[in-house]
Amino acid sequence: MTKGRMLMLGSLSLLAMTGVTLGAATPPADPGRFAQVVKVDDQYQAYNVEMVEVVGGRFWAPYPKPGEARPQPAAGGSGGVDIAAVMFRKREPIDLTGDTRLRNLARALGPTHVRVSGGWANAVYFHDSDTPPPATPPRGYQSVLTRAQWAGVVDFVKTVGGKLVVSFPVSDGARDASGVWDPDQARRLNAYTEKLGGHIYAAELINEPNAGSMVGLPKGYDAAAFARDMAVFRAFRDADAPQMKIVGPGSTGEAGFVIMPRNIGVVPTDALMSAEPRPRVDIFSYHFYGTVSKRCAAMDKSAGISPDRALDEDWLARADLNATYYKERQQRFASGTDIWITETAQAACGGDAWAATWRDSFRYVDQLGRQAKQGVSVVFHNTLAASDYALIDEATMMPRPSYWAAVLWARLMGNVVLDAGQNAGKLHLYSQCLRGTPGGVALVAINLDTANPASLSLAGKATRYTLTADNLDAGSVKLNGQTLAVGQDGVLPNLKGVAAHGMQSLPAASISYLAYPDARNPACR
């Protein structure tokens, strides 16, 4: 790095830290000179549709409204933790085929990876027939997936221009007499997908294999069993789906982040990936939840995050700590592969109630920026439209605040990650090449100060898109002062920016995207 460039980035960091204008001796930073850090996947920002949404079943229950009686805990379920009764509620299958609003909202997020998985996918039975499905799941399974439901998934992914990512059934029903994974269900699902004109782009064998029986795996499932199953999985892929990428291991709840009961016998990623025969993956994956929601507080009394800490640096920085932990494992066990976060959200167990508000949008965008700089290739938000952490409200099918931040990210942030300097103070800055504009640069500026505006000076003319809300707990947001809303058909309004040049005053508690189409950054050509 040249001395001049160090001074330039230092000036930008100082502006971010102080939020005040520096003297004339300090020139504005030039986005055209931001250096390339790394490249991410062109479909970096992705999302999950839980298998339980597709088939219907018991998913995370809504929080009681004021005045409603809270359900009493009942033992059983998640590793014997006494929270089962308050955790789940029956939900009907999502309408991926006929819900025009949902399809239009998803399409606005751009072509991207769509992952259909989750713990419920581990024990789903694919009824590969046009005859009526069984009234109850076959032995060893917990739910039934019909051809019509899967056809809806494939059609949805086609409609939004996505790449389909899945995991396969691995419960007792999907195993032979000796307990080894049987690829028959995977083979059938893949064949039917191809028959429909679809394609499974990538697959994890198991959703969260380190969680064992908590996620539907046989009791006593260990690293040796995982290695054995992964060998069968690779043989299946090579023979039946040679273009499909193997993703894994897909672990969660490590690096000091407690999101599962301590008594379930978690199998560390180190053990999973070092067992013989050594599991081989094309893409290394993990899940990141910085904590658990109130639904699962009984798992660990020290877990959870209060809403007044939502904008704190130590909360946001957990993403870096987790990424560092898993990048070390990637280098050790799958060097040279891309790394994906195949699930992430505000908190595990459906998210806290405030995950649905403006308050969590800061984490959403900050995490995308941090993990891109860390070299994570794809980040799958959990979920598109289920529970409190969803981008879209499952009851109204209307966008939540983070959805609008996601749309602007999809439209503006390209796949070349740039160095906008180190975050300092309450203003966090992340930059990537401007999508679809050779030489252009996009910058997102997150003002975490809830009381004071921040100042930012960058050279060149830009178009600015500033998101704000009336308060942190708002369920709606404004773009450059105008409230954002969609029609009943889910078609988005025209998201118009405003001209920006020179020193910019960024409102308190705001997220601003700035597009510099004429930056002439050589890394972006």
Regions picked out by a protein language model, each given a short descriptive name:
Residues 1-11:
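Bacterial N-terminal signal peptides that target proteins for export
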Residues 217, 289-314:
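Active-site His/acidic residue clusters
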Residues 281-290, 295, 371:
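Aromatic-lined glycan-binding groove of carbohydrate-active enzymes
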Residues 357:
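Ligand-binding pocket segment of bilobal, Venus flytrap-like solute-binding proteins
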Residues 283, 314-315:
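Amphipathic, small/basic residue-rich leader segments at the start of a protein or domain
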Residues 10-19:
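Bacterial N-terminal signal peptides
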Residues 318-319:
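Active-site and adjacent substrate-binding regions of carbohydrate-active enzymes
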Residues 22-260, 266-280, 324-327, 331-342, ...:
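Non-catalytic accessory regions flanking glycosidase/transglycosidase catalytic cores in CAZymes
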